[in-house]
Amino acid sequence: MRLNLSSQIVLNKVPVEFYKPKTTVEYSEISRMEKIHTDIFASVSEGCSHIADCIEKGIKAAQHEGKYYVMALGTGLSVNPVYDELVSRYEKKKLSFRNVVVFNAYEYYPLRKDSSIRSINQLKEHFLDRVDIAEQNIFTLDGSIAQEAVQDTCRLYEQRIKTFGGLDVAILGIGRMGNIAANEPGSSIQSLTRIILIGNMSREEMENSFKTKEQVPPCSLTMGVGTLLTAKTVFLTAWGDEKSEIMQKVIEGNITDTLPATFLQTHPDAQVVLDLSAAAHLTRIEHPWLVSSCEWTDKLVRSALVWLCQKINKPILKLTNKDYNENGLSELLALYGSAYNANIKIFNDLQHTITGWPGGKPDADDTYRPERAKPYPKRVVVFSPHPDDDVISMGGTIRRLVQQHHDVHLAYETSGNIAVGDEEVTRFMHFINGFNQLFAESKDSVIANKYKEIKTFFANKKEGDFDTRDILTIKGLIRRGEARIACTYNEIPLDHVHFLDLPFYESGKIEKLPMTEKDVAVVRQLLQEVKPHQIYVAGDLADPHGTHRKCTDAVLAAIDLEKEAGAEWLKDCRIWMYRGAWAEWEIENIEMCVPLSPEELRAKRNSILKHQSQMESAPFLGNDDRLFWQRAEDRNRATAQLYDNLGLACYEAMEAFVEYKPL
């Protein structure tokens, strides 16, 4: 069973020579905009293997010489896969860490001595406790020391690093503001280990680990930029779409203290290691025509023309030969003969993505429509990772499908329970207890006792405590109720609303369980029952919590099994991927775009607002200050504005989709 098919989704196939050049000369040509040595790999696993190869070589060389190998290690999602690869080599007895000395790059401050949120705990969980590093060779800053001892502790940390001969390597991730370790914007290139105030943007980013900003400690004790730059080698890692913008600035931008990671440009052996998604905005990947000759696919031509339109502020049909020549696109003139021919081709391609009939228009010529006319009506399954992703990402399209008489089913893949605040549970429990008092004269002892139990739990709840199973169940019920109300508003019968409660989600923690065959079996059973003609799945694979990717993997794995089994229904089924909660599709990838009127956009907003627990006080709103309905409207309006700027029809908003073809 293939459980990672989402990782094989390639929307823009980047020629190998642009990320894995064969010679130094080729690398110099395509990377001339880059100011740090950057290695790009097709997958996270390949990138991690590269880093692990370098680390293994260094450790073994030090062992051969009878020396320590000294590492400064960061924590987080970017570096964890590297640690997994190193652990794998240890477990296969390919590598020992007995001569390794580790310095934790930063620690939160202040912390209680018994605090469970220490960064060293994360480092131990993901790496140190899984290999043979001696306990006496692990050093960390102490987040529980008295404030007056901080300066001496930081000075001692610097001295201890020097005692071991300095750092051989630093393995770091990067924050959204370009921070490395806990060095916030404004940090000096000469800065040493010190206490630093955690900035507001970093606090928002840390919500992924702490549930709310309020739980994030106010400060960190961190190795300084100057300390990290003393390492013989520095690896900076980043994976996924969400890191692509900051990595472009760090790699191709100027050195500035507002992006501390740019100081790595001064290091003689700093190496940035990215997957293709994280490298998406580098010039050689996003605009390859600016650094080399290209193999011009339809998507690359569309991307180039949209870029040109935005750069010189012209619609497609007004682009001239001169515009092409002056902006590095003369190859297209040779390919198409003239700007006019290229303009018409791309204009028509974009025009054909627009449809007001997402389920196909019955009894109409569908030659140039994104969705086929028959069969009509269609059976449709919309898979929603959380109980609100459906309306956030494609609420307008769902209403259009219902109004056009298609048989629409909503499948909510997870309970979404940990994304409900404790106050919501308290509010509902007050109501239930009051209902018991008013209409049952408090005779229902189960309700009365459960009310007291939950009230007591919340009163005594401490930092790091996990909710009880009963509380998680109540939180799940709250989200189910909201989803049902939204479906009723959108005229979807409740017997077409399916709560799948995939097992991987039910860890009760931010970090989920691995997705397994049990999850796939639940999805597959629904598909076998409905036998859909259309499937909609989340394409928001940049979701910072990872739930969207796992949910999509479960659906794609189920489809894969049905394909292997020769399921008849799949032969007449199209699969569409949506975005909207965390990102939007790039215009060169859009294959169907559904326009929304002002009234339809307002109805979409109303659908989202039915999910009251996900408004202002909800945990995990991510790094975006806007509420989900605001994000959705802004993205949908931006897509419509982009089409308008290119000279196509002007709409209030648009929802975009990309077709997935089973691998």
Residue ranges of predicted features:
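Histidine-anchored nucleotide/phosphate-binding helix
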Residues: 82-93, 390-415, 419
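ATP/nucleoside-binding phosphotransfer catalytic cores, i.e., glycine-rich phosphate-binding loops
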Residues: 2-12, 22-30, 232-328
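Metal-dependent de-N-acetylase/amidase catalytic core
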Residues: 203-211, 215-220, 312-381, 400-404, ...
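Class I SAM-dependent methyltransferase SAM-binding "motif I" and its flanking Rossmann-like core
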Residues: 181-225
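Glycine-rich N-terminal segment of FAD-binding domains in flavoprotein oxidoreductases
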Residues: 61-94
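N-terminal glycine-/serine-/threonine-rich phosphate-binding loop
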Residues: 2-70, 366-367, 374
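Ligand-binding beta-strand-loop-alpha-helix segment within the catalytic cores
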Residues: 21-35, 95-169
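Glycine-rich anion-binding loop/nest that anchors nucleotide
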Residues: 171-173, 209-251, 258, 274-275, ...
